[in-house]
Amino acid sequence: QTLVTGANGHLGYNLVVALRDAGHRVRAGVRSLGDPARTARLKALGGVELVEAELRRPDQLRAAMDGIDVAFHAAAVYDYVTPGRGQEILDASVRGAEAALRAAADARVRKVVLTSSVVTLPFTAPDDPPSDENDWTTDLRVPYVRAKTEGERVAWRVAGELGLNMVTVLPGAILGPGFARNTPSIDAIEAMSMGALRFGAPDMNFPLVDVRDVVAAHVLAAEQDCEGRFAAINDTQPTFRSMLETMHAIDPKIPLPMMQMPGFLARALPLFDRLNHAMLGTPQSLSSELAASLQGKIWNVSNRRAKERLGWRQSITMEQSLRDKLETIRANRNRHA
């Protein structure tokens, strides 16, 4: 029997569906059973047991872990741009991970697969070799980056203290279908589709991966006799311009950028982001801290370890992933309208 925390999120929901379809007994953990917005899709699946698993409630987590063989801890607060949420994001990642692991150990769960992030790995200079699972970022000025990094480090410490069998999966920015509410990754794509970069694309890249490939990495990490960290990210990390060219080919109404934005304007990207939000209604997706962290750096992450140790492969192209994401964004927008 399996447990998925954060089961109403983009990754969590797709993981629940995949496990159920593979014939596993699935327990889906959510913050509150009394919130229809967070439970309706899970209830509609059928064959899935819903339980409350609030990260601040150790008693709920312990009850949710009872009888579980493999626990997938995917619950997190994912936010780059909302001011004043730093402590909430940090607590959910650090205290939440520790509480989940202690509950799993107490319930004698056989294995825990914890969802971390490629943001725990350092950005690199353009000519440097890619970062991998042996590396840890030291630039913690972005609250979400700090939360995921400190959360995973605490998880490894606690797992060691408790003798708990744990592996971590480090996804990139998750694309693809199967979401009801936007994440920052989805906000970025929606903003681009609405013309947020029509006047210029920054000379930056994006660490993409499809949700179906992230699910596959989690399942393989659970099934294989393995240990350590595994980066689940596409083979290449595309530039914003190449992403927009692909999106324009999917939907010609999505505008291409008029130019490559000069490097000296990169620091002003958060200002442009706020202006686009005010004038075009695009979602905000970039903070000043993240823009500063990326100055002169790129996302360059190796997925070699996941390929060699797990037998994982990128199976969904960027084009298919963007197509499915754009279709889901439009469907959600129409439903809410």
Residue ranges, per PLM feature:
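N-terminal Rossmann NAD(P)H-binding glycine-rich loop of SDR-like oxidoreductase domains
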Residues: 2-24
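NAD(P)H-binding glycine-rich loop region in Rossmannoid oxidoreductase-like domains
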Residues: 33-95, 103
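Conserved Rossmann-fold NAD(P)-dependent oxidoreductase catalytic core, especially the SDR/UDP-sugar
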Residues: 73, 77, 83-144
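A conserved pocket-lining segment of Rossmann-fold NAD(P)-dependent short-chain dehydrogenase/reductase
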Residues: 82-83, 138-140, 180, 187-209, ...
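Short-chain dehydrogenase/reductase
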Residues: 90-94, 129-130, 134, 140-153, ...
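Conserved beta-loop-beta element that borders a ligand/cofactor-binding pocket
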Residues: 116, 151-177
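Glycine/proline-rich active-site loop of Rossmann-fold NAD(P)-dependent oxidoreductases
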Residues: 161-164, 176-188, 220-230, 253-255
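Mid/C-terminal beta-alpha module of Rossmann-like enzyme folds, strongest
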Residues: 217-285, 303, 308, 317-337
